[in-house]
Amino acid sequence: MSRYKKDNDGVTFLLVCIDIYSRRLFVKTLKSKKGQEVAEALQDVFKEIGVTPMTIYSDDGKEFYNSHVKELLAKNFVNLFSPKSEIKCAIVERANRTLKTRLAKYMTQKYNRRYVDVLQQVVNGINNSVNRGIGKKPVDVERGDFSTPMPVDSVKIKFRVGDHVRIAAKRGQFDKGYEQGWTTEVYMSNSTTTPTAHAPSEESIINGKSIPQPMLAGAIFGVIFGIFCLILHVCLVRYLVKARAKHIPKVRKVKAKKGKKDKKLKESKKSDDTSTGASTGSSIAM
């Protein structure tokens, strides 16, 4: 929202928080991403909720990992986690889309770009709308409404310990389908945890040889894993091109030889010169 800050008293960012249980939205305005300002906004969110949360999930930005926020969370006994995957915080990202859509409709209707005056009204409207994920309004959700948790062992274990795997690479919306969709690095599954996740090993054993593994933080869920069996047949395309280039015959450049056409052109030029000279002399004599 930085492009609208001139019309909204310098408000550049919006701190969006969502309660995963009730899907209730809490939004605070920020003029910068400084740690002190973010910590104060989080404190206001805690007061609005009424209780401090047990866990906070966020990205690994410096606006959350600084001394001010760390002190606030330690004071309220709150744990902060940040996923290392590209896919993270999907619930709040979807909430951002809903919030931006409603703000854009309001600004289009009013023919201006000022939204701070009605921001909390828009948030209140979202909280009073039925959420498709839970089938209820977030403001109507009470503790105990969803007493049946998801089964822990609902995901089947796809890989065994010792399997060599690759990680699925992030794909864009317009990426070509024939391009490689997996990382070049190969990992070996070392252990399986509950809920189902696979921890990578520090080294991989291929044909009895110990090969160091690339550094990888955290555990990997089976959803982004792909089995990799033909390890010995992997090679980069550029090496194949060089190997093939040795057998390609070189194309020799052949200079064009002077043929009969060139001689005829020279003879025609000489004849033209003599004819023009003769005609010129005859005209002077007369």
Swiss-Prot record:
Residues 264-273 have a biased composition (Basic and acidic residues). Residues 1-146 form the Integrase catalytic domain. The lineage of its organism: Eukaryota, Metazoa, Ecdysozoa, Nematoda, Chromadorea. One of its GO terms (molecular function) is nucleic acid binding. Residues 252-286 are annotated as: Disordered. InterPro entries: Integrase_cat-core, RNaseH-like_sf, RNaseH_sf. Residues 274-286 have a biased composition (Low complexity). PANTHER family: CHROMO DOMAIN-CONTAINING PROTEIN (PTHR46585:SF1), INTEGRASE CORE DOMAIN CONTAINING PROTEIN (PTHR46585). Residues 252-263 have a biased composition (Basic residues). It comes from Caenorhabditis elegans. GO terms for biological process: DNA integration. This is Putative uncharacterized transposon-derived protein F54H12.3.
